[in-house]
Every structure is written in C-alpha cells, then in structure tokens.
Curated annotation (Swiss-Prot):
Catalyzes the conversion of (8S)-3',8-cyclo-7,8-dihydroguanosine 5'-triphosphate to cyclic pyranopterin monophosphate (cPMP). Its EC number is 4.6.1.17. One of its GO terms (molecular function) is cyclic pyranopterin monophosphate synthase activity. It catalyses: (8S)-3',8-cyclo-7,8-dihydroguanosine 5'-triphosphate = cyclic pyranopterin phosphate + diphosphate. This is Cyclic pyranopterin monophosphate synthase. Substrate binds at L75, C76, H77, M113, E114. InterPro entries: MoaC (IPR023045), MoaC_bact/euk (IPR047594), MoaC_sf (IPR036522), MoCo_biosynth_MoaA/MoaC (IPR050105), Mopterin_CF_biosynth-C_dom (IPR002820).
Length: 161
C-alpha cells in the first residue's frame, strides 16, 4: 500500500514538495448525484424555478469551485487549470441529477481534488437553489471516476459497482 504523502516522518501534515516532478498532462473526472422528489426534478427540467436556471448556476459554481480548490482544501496546491467542464444530466427514471466534472492541466500535481470539488459544489448549489421546495434531497455518492497522468499512473473506477 502507498504511503500518505501529506504526512511527514514526524506524523505532521505538510504540503508535498512537487518542485522536482516533471510536468505532464493530467486529467481527472468525478461524479456526484442529487436525488430529489420527481416534482422537484420536473421543476428544474421545465425551467420553472423562481431562482432561475438551476443547471447553469450549478455549472458555473462547479467551475468556480475547481479553480478555488486550493483555498478550500488544506495542503492542495494552487493549479493553473487548462480545462474545467461540468455537465449536468437529469435522470428522471431515478429522480436525480447526475453531475460529471472534468479537470485538465499540464503540471506537476494531479487534479483529482479539483474534479471532486467541482462535482461536489455543483451538487451543493442544486441543493441550495431547491431547498425552499424540498429540504430532504440527498447528495451522493460523490466519487472519482478516472485520473490520468503523473507517477501514480492511471485510474478508472469499475463501472460495475
């Protein structure tokens, strides 16, 4: 099993030194879900929410969150992201919204946390915009779908979960 990289020999949290690492293209994808009543989902799909376009607002929030991950998650490096994409899809058969984020850069450290933050904040934004009509929405699961680039190699979740 790999060692925790954010813990030093004395057991203290620290920011990993990436200065000696080579710059490579790195990409990560994550997903999150928001489950709600069918009436709440229909309101979003039909564009009848009094606060405006829920998907557009959540998309922008997710993109902004990816760009500010280093301010939210301790020990994350500030990154020069070259691409952030947030896609939202209503899944009426499951009464939920699926959010998928993609982050990419050429750099010395990965973008997994940025992708996870983008998907999570987009989900939180949907909750915030819809809580006036439904407070018992459920956020989750949130997970990393895939990552590529860097020394640790590529990862892809088993989609048969």
């Amino acid at each position: 099993m790999s060692q925790l990289t954010h813990i030093n020999a004395a057991g203290e949290a620290h920011m990993v030194d990436v200065s000696a690492k080579a710059e490579t293209v790195r990409e990560a994808r994550a997903e999150a879900f928001v489950t709600m009543h069918s009436e709440t989902l229909a309101m979003i799909i039909d564009g009848k929410h009094h606060k405006g376009d829920v998907f557009a607002t959540a998309r922008i929030a997710g993109i902004q969150a990816a760009k500010r991950t280093w301010e939210l998650i301790p020990l994350c490096h500030p990154l020069l992201l070259s691409k952030v994409e947030v896609q939202l899809q209503a899944e009426s058969e499951h009464n939920r919204v699926r959010i998928e984020s993609l982050c990419r850069l050429t750099g010395k450290t990965g973008v997994e946390m940025e992708a996870l933050t983008a998907a999570s904040v987009a989900a939180l934004t949907i909750y915030d915009m819809c809580k006036a009509v439904q407070k018992d929405m459920v956020i989750g699961p949130v997970r990393l779908l895939a990552k590529s680039g860097g020394n640790s190699g590529d990862f892809k979740v088993d989609t048969h979960d």
